[in-house]
């Protein structure tokens, strides 16, 4: 292609740089001046959303080529590259539009089906927009208090709370968290969320009625970060709390508690923490149990003080909080801060990356699944703004605003929701600490003076900033954000550089975190910073723009004060801002604001009315708003006054009052067996039950000897009854039956003594075991389960004979199938201490008390997992879904999925799969249930031939945590034995503080069938480099080889 010099001009137009551009040439925004260039408009549209840095670099290299022919060839290739990028972007946009249309149809269909199920008693009241908040348990909120706006009301409320002594757990996992000198902006993980959770913990700990607050995070003992992040515990002293902490206890107050998990001696990004979440959950569980006992001794009369709530912040902490709340049976709260689906849609709209590339970079699908689980498990979701609910949470399968209003209306009328649940969305704006704010008492109409009297030196950070300016007395436009593309700082610099009146009237200060060397920054942040530096050079902004390299967190108030002293303006031009805490800080220092119209700033501006909202994509709008506030003194003064007048509405006491009032509306929950023990003062104990007469009587009272439950009988007589009612009836019946045991204590004692001497009274023997082996090999009994069991038994034969090791069988089978397996393989039920059945839906223990029924079901385990169990309403929806699979696939000759009533149980609905290859992946089944507000855990098992549906927080891994909580079974002294693959809950069994042995060559057939079409690859959630996960060397591994492997990895001493 000869003579194509036009290409260079074309690229110059795209990049707006190069020798062909001079000062007389118009800016990119020709439309500002009333002229319109179709060519320029096309160029802007083509490269919209693409990073210009790479294009600029390629263009420079092409320009430097001496040979005209080679230069033209390179430039032509660049044009084709740009065209291809635009084509890919358009293709991605079309695919995304189709996906969104499909999603809308699925949601509408799910909503119609849910409404149809509940149509028996619909009324006009459900059709209105009911705004009264109720808990999902149907309790009224008469005890909830109005918003406090006066000192008298606040004092009255504080006096009312003094009798309470709450223990609250907050979780925020990623970033670097400490109480003082926070390194905000150090990296993308250490931002506003870190400051928010620290200040929230500190403020809650200062409130009346709150005894202790623990902020759980990751312990980082790495040479690349400060030593303080490796300290196990850090106290957060309260600020200005003379009137709020009248009664201090030994362990009261707020604390940062750092739990070790993940790579040791290494600080890693949040995207790499997902495989280590189970390890954190196990460590946090141990801390909470220990702290509950300590607090019980101090303020609970010897009874454990369980958390009033566990509050997860961001998706990773939400996932952890869900597992912890399920293990402890306590309420969960969630705050998203930044949501995965919203980020995914933004990245797809930009067109730079495909969906697979986005997932690979950000682990976005794992993050979204964690957020969906948080919706499933949360009693309440706390948001900063209404926009977060209406535009971001509604993107999720588990939340539908329309269906949520209908469910709320039914709860208000005390009408059944047929097993459907929706978390309550609560808007509680973040608070702010005002103790460090020094009001500006000077004459606001006078010229700013900087240390002219030398009575007190100016803050050091003022000098650092003003050294950049040729005229430091001009009003300062202040932006405080890390150099992240979504913060949109490049558009701000471009708007400032292209608006001559603004440059003449004001200076620009960019506080972009801390840096030592640009080359050592992350690639994205370095790219943004380089772009800004190039624009400063391009527009010749030297002497007009400050960009200091370092600042401390304690310098931030002084930076705001400097901007206010110069009668400046604070700007947040982010493309979307979840809340905008810096806007509140700026307002508190008397700074008017210019902020993005997308997200939380809309709500802040509605309350404060102290500035102007702008379109972050329109640099002309940004420049005009800044110029207006800087040039019009009366407007500036009005915005300043409005902000200072209304800022008290964002104080931390106000936030905490709303927080605690909402928390009071949640139904209290705690481990059921401990609650019953506390009701009986004669037999109450602070610790888990011990192996004594008291425990044997408890077992007889609280555990039903059974081999095959009467599951179908309750369904025939009225399956709509709540699981609580059925459990209570069973327990009452067993109570009546066991009266004879209570009347004969002497006989019971002699039985216990005899059984103990003969080693027959084994239950609950798992407390006495030094090591527990959990066999969770997911294959048919005839296909390797029996061989695996015998191999493990043989590997620890000596310890097994001594009784120092115990065994648990964890499978998808029900208790009938397990008994058949034991009989057929000539194994004794007492070879195992416990049986986790139905994928975690049931828990049994072996017993010596009855040869006919050698299994004891733990009814309290049911009370632990029944949270949000949909019961008969869920079962009917599952049956309808199973029937729809047949219709959609056109398989008229036989059903693809049929209900298996024989193997179903009260807390596990089972389905037989006739054609595993036809059934949609498990993620689709979970999606269908969530769209209809049904919360459950769907597990594809037995190589795809069976589906188990159990309560949302039930699983085999959670059952192990229950055994730790109730019986003290040490998870760190547990070995889980699995195959190379397994059921769809396989990944949950791998991570944690326990050791995991992967048997080579076992359960290999399930890999492609069950784990195809996963939402995310297994490597995103399992760290196979973990030292606690080890694999046998070959398929022919003998029991001797297994023993040697266990000794090598520290399970046994050699």
UniProtKB/Swiss-Prot annotation:
Amino acid composition bias (Basic and acidic residues), ranges on this chain: 104-115
One MF annotation (Gene Ontology) recorded for this entry: sucrose-phosphate synthase activity
Activity regulation note: Activity is regulated by phosphorylation and moderated by concentration of metabolites and light.
InterPro entries from the UniProt entry: Glyco_trans_1, SPP-like_dom, SPS, SPS_C, SPS_pln, Sucrose_synth_GT-B1
Start and end residues of each stretch annotated as Disordered: 104-125, 674-693, 708-727
E.C. code: 2.4.1.14
Keyword Transferase: yes
A GO BP annotation: sucrose biosynthetic process
Family, similarity comment: Belongs to the glycosyltransferase 1 family.
Protein name, UniProt field: Probable sucrose-phosphate synthase 1
Organism annotation: Craterostigma plantagineum
